Curated annotation (Swiss-Prot):
Tagged with keyword Coiled coil: yes
Native organism: Mus musculus (Mouse)
LRR repeats: 51-72, 73-94, 98-119
Domain of life where this protein originates: Eukaryota
UniProt KW Flavoprotein keyword: no
Any one Pfam family match given in the protein's UniProt record, by short name: LRR_4
UniProt biased composition (Basic residues): 325-336
Name of the molecule in the record: Leucine-rich repeat and IQ domain-containing protein 3
Domain (IQ) ranges: 215-244
Location of region: Disordered: 324-343
InterPro entries in alphabetical order: Leu-rich_rpt, Leu-rich_rpt_4, LRR-IQ_domain_protein, LRR_dom_sf
Keyword line: Coiled coil, Leucine-rich repeat, Repeat
Coiled coil region boundaries: 556-617
Length: 633
């Protein structure tokens, strides 16, 4: 394994060229790199890792991090425990737009001016610079916090509002370096972590920082309160209006609803009309379905036409591809239950629109309808279908074969001797008379249609007036019930307050009794404790005296034993001295005897030698023999 940078000879070798190309292609897809404690000196090989998101180069010998400029997608960068002394310029850090966590602790940074380039990181949340020389300088934290705006946590503490807002004194909980703001921004590295684990760890750290700020930042707490107030204020009309829409039901014809509103109230009505799609119906009137309505919507009869410009009901008479058309609005789930409730109402709020074929109208009727539209009558219903633009031809009556045969025979026999002018005049007269009768009949039909139309409009108006009257009546009843309910609520609340007061009075009385009992118990406990203290002191004194007596007796016994031992030692010494003297005398006697014996032996030897010299050394022969004398002489 190669430590540090790979040499140029190895990378530029011909046999390694294809291998290097493959490595470069693979490095483009790297998202996670971890080289911790490998004694690396450079990171030039990371220039091609354009997809890198998590980079861990801790505990190495790096001095330059410029090769990371191409890694634009970095989220976490761990460079702690290296030998970095200077950081790249602001352009380098502005390119890392996704960088959220940066670990630079335990490096050689010494100048605050060099660290201020980190202000180019637009999304940096966590930064560590402890155990660096620059962290010992005065104002180090103030400079970093106010130069890197998105920063939320520095070293071991989350940034407080007191560090950002000048001259703002906060309670102990929100102060700088308070225990509530402490957070371990750099957890210990775990061996064998994957990219997913690192991403989870990053998310956990960021969420934990945000949670600490949300609970310990006065600015964020006030902002949360204001946002909640604004949202509640914005939604309060909806919740207030929603309370009145409870239970009154009417039946309407199951058709498509077309509502063109001119104000916000029209949108509100559209939201509260629920229509259920009907099954396949061809040429028949659809079933009746239920629908919620509010009495407030029919409050004013004159303004009803202004709020809703068009409520047209189109019967479903076409069946396309065997499927019915779906309405825009969703189905209300409780419609069947509402139908059963609406049938039991005291007031009948139903009305029906009869389905009939459209009669034939002349051009006069069309003009009359146009005139009515120009006059803009209030009772002219907009949901009726318009008159047909073209006049339909009357049906032609065909003669039978027998009549045609008779006519041909008559013309063949009587044509030559008979003139037909009179018959032509008669036929013309009858045809004109028939035409006049047809026109009169059509005019009568048109008049009857107009009369029925007016009657229908009058009936509709009466129905609407009845509905408005009934809705007003229902509103009055609802108001009465609401007032009664409010009065009942106030009564219950007053009764509840009285009960609470009684409970409070009872509680205070019990509290006083408990306080008296507690004071009595405390006094008894104090007296008992004093008595116990006296008893314990007396017992302690007795015990102390008994211990003293026992110690005195022990001392006397030990002194007597020691004296007895000393006497024994003296006697033993005397006996030993006597024995030693006896032994010494015996030894002296033995030594003297031995010395005397040896002296005697020496004397005997000397005498023998003298005698020998006298006897043998007188003559010369003896002198010659003296040379061969034994050694023991």
């Amino acid at each position: 394994m190669f430590h540090g940078t790979i040499t140029k000879e190895l990378t530029s070798h011909e046999e390694w060229s294809h291998y290097n190309e493959n490595i470069i292609e693979d490095q483009k897809d790297f998202v996670f790199v971890k080289y911790s404690g490998l004694h690396l000196k450079s990171m030039e090989n990371l220039q091609t890792c354009i997809s890198l998101r998590v980079c861990i180069f801790s505990n190495n010998f790096l001095t330059d991090i410029q090769p990371l400029q191409s890694c634009k997608k970095l989220i976490k960068l761990d460079l702690h425990g290296n030998q970095i002394k200077t950081l790249p310029d602001k352009n380098f850090w502005s390119g890392l737009k996704n960088l959220k966590l940066l670990y630079l602790h335990d490096n050689g940074f010494s100048k605050l001016k060099n660290i201020c380039v980190l202000s180019g990181c637009v999304s940096l949340i966590g930064l560590t610079m402890f155990d660096c020389p620059v962290s010992l300088k005065k104002g180090y934290r103030h400079v970093l916090v106010n130069s890197i705006w998105p920063l939320k946590a520095l070293d071991h503490h989350v940034i407080s509002d007191e560090e950002i807002i000048q001259n703002w004194r906060l309670p102990e909980r929100f102060k700088t370096f308070s225990p509530s703001l402490f957070f371990n921004l750099y957890p210990a590295l775990i061996k064998g972590t994957t990219y997913e684990d690192e991403i989870k760890n990053i998310k956990h750290i960021i969420s934990r920082i945000n949670e600490i700020l949300a609970h310990n930042s006065p600015v964020l707490i006030i902002q949360r309160w204001i946002r909640g107030f604004i949202v509640r204020k914005h939604l309060s009309p909806y919740f207030k209006h929603k309370k009145h829409y409870h239970g009154k039901m009417i039946r309407v014809l199951e058709t498509k609803l077309i509502c063109i509103g001119r104000s916000d109230e029209d949108k509100y009505l559209e939201d509260f009309f629920f229509i259920k799609p009907e099954c396949n119906i061809k040429g028949k009137v659809a079933h009746w379905k239920q629908m919620r309505y509010s009495p407030a919507d029919f409050k004013y009869s004159t303004e009803y036409g202004k709020h809703i410009s068009c409520l047209s009901y189109e019967l479903k008479t076409k069946y396309i591809d065997g499927k019915s058309k779906q309405p825009r609005h969703h189905i209300h789930k409780g419609q069947k239950a509402m139908k059963a409730e609406s049938e039991d109402e005291e007031v009948d709020t139903e009305f029906r629109i009869s389905a009939m074929k459209i009669p034939l109208y002349s051009s006069r009727s069309l003009k009359y309808g146009a005139m009515l539209k120009e006059m803009k009558w209030d009772y002219f219903p907009q949901y009726l279908q318009p008159f047909p633009a073209t006049r339909q031809k009357p049906p032609v009556k065909r003669e039978t074969l027998w009549k045609l045969k008779k006519r041909r025979e008559f013309l063949a026999t009587q044509r030559a001797g008979m003139k037909l002018h009179m018959f032509d005049d008669v036929d013309k007269y009858y045809s004109e008379q028939k035409q006049h009768e047809e026109e009169a009949r059509k005019f009568a039909a048109m008049v009857t249609a107009q009369v029925t139309q007016e009657r229908a409009s009058v009936n509709i108006r009466e129905k609407l007036n009845k509905k408005i009257y009934m809705t007003r009546k229902l509103m009055e009843k609802d108001n009465e019930t609401i007032q009664k309910g409010l009065q009942q609520i106030w009564r219950e609340r007053l009764a509840y307050l009285e009960k609470v007061r009684e409970r409070k009075f009872m509680f205070l009385a019990e509290k006083k009794l408990n306080a008296a009992d507690q004071s009595l118990v405390i006094s008894l406990n104090n007296e008992r404790s004093i008595l116990l203290k006296g008893i314990t002191q007396v017992e302690r004194l007795k015990k102390h005296m008994s211990e003293k007596k026992a110690k005195h007796l022990d001392v006397i016994e030990k002194w007597e034993e020691q004296k007895y031992k000393q006497d024994l030692l003296m006697e033993m010494k005397k006996l030993r001295v006597e024995e030693i003297q006896k032994r010494h005398c015996e030894e002296k006697f033995v030594i003297d005897t031995l010395i005397l014996q040896k002296g005697y032996e020496r004397l005997e030897e000397a005498k023998a030698k003298v005698e020998y010299i006298k006897t043998f050394y007188t003559s010369k022969s003896h002198k010659r023999r003296n040379e061969a004398m034994p050694d023991h002489i």
